[in-house]
């Protein structure tokens, strides 16, 4: 019964979408990494993005105007990681805040002597546990250009990671995945990345396991060959986690 009601509600949202299929097609054409998707995959992505926009509010900060182009771009890229999962992976929070450019955010760090330092940092995005996703449009508008950097995917992958209670590079895995294998591969390659530079992989990923997972997820969707070249085992487990094969689709 609940499934029937859910399906009916979602179909009603899709039937009353403010954007047509042509609107979504034009939006997708502006995002290079979506070129690898076939027609059926694009249609599913459009449906997911429509449901996403119904479920999440997107508001501007510091006077930023959230246009349809902004909403479509954020929705399409946010939904790419869950294309073969479901919108339920983004449950438990409701808002996205867009700044025109990088913004200052309070930060707390603990040094090697255990002293706590309070300060602020300029950020291009962040994701809060059970809270909003915050993005800089100056950075987000260049996401999806197949250059290995995608702040939208980065922050929304943090949301997937947080489903286990905190961002630690260990999201809830698919039923057919081996948690021990995930831990072994991610831990081994994170340790390697802390001491060895890899072409096409942002050094920010060496910060901690959560950032490692998010940074490599960017590469998985943007420039998958770079990930295969650097860490083939991580590419393989991400294929199983995201249920997507971007390298095969791009060829």
Residue ranges and their predicted role:
Residues 1-22:
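Charged, compositionally biased N-terminal leader segments and the immediate start
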Residues 38, 147-163, 214:
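Active-site recognition of the HExxH zinc-binding catalytic motif
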Residues 11-14, 29-32, 53, 58, ...:
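Metalloprotease/metallohydrolase-associated module, dominated by Zn2+-dependent proteases
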Residues 59-71:
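Short, charged early-sequence alpha-helical segments and their helix-coil boundaries
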Residues 16-55:
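Amphipathic alpha-helical packing elements
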Residues 45, 49, 70-74, 78:
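Short amphipathic alpha-helical coiled-coil/interface segments
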Residues 1-3, 156, 167:
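Intrinsically disordered, low-complexity linker/tail regions enriched in Pro/Ser/Thr
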């Amino acid at each position: 019964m609940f499934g029937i009601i859910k399906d009916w509600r979602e179909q009603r949202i899709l039937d009353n979408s403010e954007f047509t299929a042509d609107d979504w097609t034009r939006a997708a054409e502006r995002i290079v990494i979506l070129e690898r998707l076939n027609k059926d995959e694009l249609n599913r992505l459009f449906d997911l993005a429509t449901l996403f926009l119904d479920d999440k509010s997107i508001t501007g900060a510091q006077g930023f105007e959230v246009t349809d182009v902004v909403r479509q771009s954020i929705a399409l890229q946010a939904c790419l990681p869950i294309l073969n999962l479901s919108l339920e992976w983004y449950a438990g929070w409701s808002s996205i805040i867009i700044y025109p450019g990088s913004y200052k955010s309070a930060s707390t760090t603990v040094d090697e002597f255990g002293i706590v330092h309070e300060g602020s940092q300029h950020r291009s995005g962040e994701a809060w546990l059970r809270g909003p996703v915050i993005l800089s449009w100056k950075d987000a508008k260049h996401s999806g250009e197949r250059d290995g950097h995608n702040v939208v995917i980065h922050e929304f992958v943090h949301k997937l990671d947080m489903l286990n209670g905190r961002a630690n590079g260990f999201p809830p895995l698919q039923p057919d995945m081996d948690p021990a294998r995930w831990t072994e591969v991610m831990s081994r390659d994170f340790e390697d990345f802390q001491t060895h530079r890899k072409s096409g992989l942002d050094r920010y990923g060496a910060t901690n396991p959560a950032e490692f997972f998010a940074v490599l997820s960017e590469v998985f969707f943007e420039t998958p060959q770079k990930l295969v070249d650097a860490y083939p085992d991580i590419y393989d487990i991400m294929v199983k986690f995201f249920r997507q094969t971007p390298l095969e689709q791009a060829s």
